[in-house]
């Protein structure tokens, strides 16, 4: 059996370094001659937040479905994160950053009115049996990479988002609930719906159930 496929839009190392430099340059530009305290804050911010730039880009890309918009959103989100960094006292920098990326992405989506941001399905459903569906079942083989991307593109933004957070980034239900600002039970039901719709699309286009 082929290895499970991790479908994402990850930056390569060169892109990551370039975007990190842009973020750092923009921040430094706001502090023409940063003092020791500002330099310490920037160093702490870089250490805590820059390792999550790939995850930030991945989420923005799936939500926006546009590379240029995704990069703009990531940079804007990092600048917002830096402005608020003095108030960050938690231990989960990735979840905190992804919350900002999510909010920034939805602000752009609403501005462009590019998609219907709400799902058309009832959230309160039974989820027994769905949780046994693993990422390997949904994102199965590399030869189906393009088809999986097409299937994801057909989903509402909220479904793309929850699949990305759970199966691409491996976040817990609690982390996803915090990021999406919904109850954990809604996370489970929405994830079950998203998996089901993804499997339906794949079954229809590949000709067999996943």
Give names to the regions the model predicted.
Residues 48-67, 84, 152, 203-205:
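Amphipathic, Lys/Arg- and hydrophobic-enriched alpha-helical face
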């Amino acid at each position: 059996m082929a290895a499970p496929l991790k479908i994402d839009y990850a930056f390569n190392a060169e892109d990551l370094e370039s975007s990190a430099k842009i973020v750092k340059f923009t921040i430094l530009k706001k502090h023409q001659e940063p003092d020791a305290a500002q330099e310490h804050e920037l160093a702490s911010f870089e250490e805590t937040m820059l390792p999550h730039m790939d995850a930030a880009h991945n989420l923005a890309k799936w939500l926006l479905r546009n590379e240029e918009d995704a990069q703009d959103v990531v940079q804007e989100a990092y600048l917002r994160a830096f402005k608020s960094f003095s108030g960050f006292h938690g231990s989960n920098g990735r979840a905190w950053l992804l919350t900002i990326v999510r909010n920034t992405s939805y602000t752009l989506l609403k501005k462009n009115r590019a998609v219907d941001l709400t799902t058309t399905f009832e959230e309160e459903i039974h989820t027994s049996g769905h949780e046994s569906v693993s990422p390997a079942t949904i994102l199965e083989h590399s030869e189906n990479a393009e088809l999986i991307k097409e299937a994801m593109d057909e989903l509402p933004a909220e479904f793309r988002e929850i699949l990305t957070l759970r199966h691409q980034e491996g976040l817990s239900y609690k982390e996803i609930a915090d990021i999406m600002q919904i109850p954990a039970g809604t996370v489970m039901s929405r994830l079950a719906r998203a998996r089901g719709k993804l499997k339906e699309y794949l079954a229809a286009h590949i000709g067999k159930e996943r």
